[in-house]
Amino acid sequence: KEVPSKDLGMMAMAYGHVYVASVAFGDNDSQTVRAFLEAESYEGPSFNIAYSHCIAHGYNLADGLDHQKMAVECGAWPLYRFDPRRTAMGENPLKLDSRAPKISFEEYALSETRFRMLMKTNPERSKRLLEEAQRVVQAKYDMYQQLANLHYGSDADQETN
């Protein structure tokens, strides 16, 4: 695609009172379980966004968990939990659970037929889109990291005075 996809998690977080998590049990099963337990215990609306492999991605579904891991490792699928209850405790509601990208988006993308098809039919466009996707993925991770590092509570109050 020529434009980045919508960030449904960020849209839900903007409401401020919705529990939101992004999970991929193929990368971090304990984070997935923790997110589901937190969402279950939350009194308000909760929204868990789970990476799901699909036959249309063009790989053996027996390798689905490995592809989930690659999606997280390249930054295309950041893992996080946004729990509004943390603000009442003076804590940042956003916890970024994934690490900084350690493989390229291209490495992840070219492991799936849905992306390789464009490389075969239109290599120039594919190269351009892969480069742009890498920039978008890195910018998205950087934004989540900045938001997760914001200070809340009494420390934040003192910094603004």
Label every model-predicted segment:
Residues 1-100:
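Glycine-rich ThDP/TPP pyrophosphate-binding loop and its adjacent helix/strand module
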